[in-house]
Amino acid sequence: MSALWFRKNLFEALVLLHEISNRKFMSEIQRFGESARWSDLVIYRGEARWVEVADDATADARGQIAQVLSQINGTLERIQSRRTDLLQVLIFLADLNDSSILNELWDEWVPAGHPPVRACVEARLSPGYYVEMVISAAVADECQDK
């Protein structure tokens, strides 16, 4: 499964998010972009959860980390949230030696005074991938039942 396929399907799922007239995000689990093994996005009780990997697996670690942070921005925008709404980010690096690059880009990206809970571990990722992030964020009020 390519990162491009994932992004395309995630975008389609997020478009559906805005088209649903009966929004029950507070009481029902909402799954978007479902496959047999996973959903691209899940929203429950005002919290969205999803995973990001770089669209371009040919980029180096710096390029992939920058891509993933940018992709998080895009998903947050689509669910009407912001980086200040991030609750938790779990980061998997193929090589912990890249953590200095991660920290440099992360410190520029995270809004001052609003860091989410964060963990960073080394993991054996799919070939060509340097980083994978699991994100949770509060969903904007207008995307929830009142």
What is the meaning of each model-derived region?
Residues 11-87, 93-146:
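N-terminal presequence-like segments and the immediate start of the first folded domain
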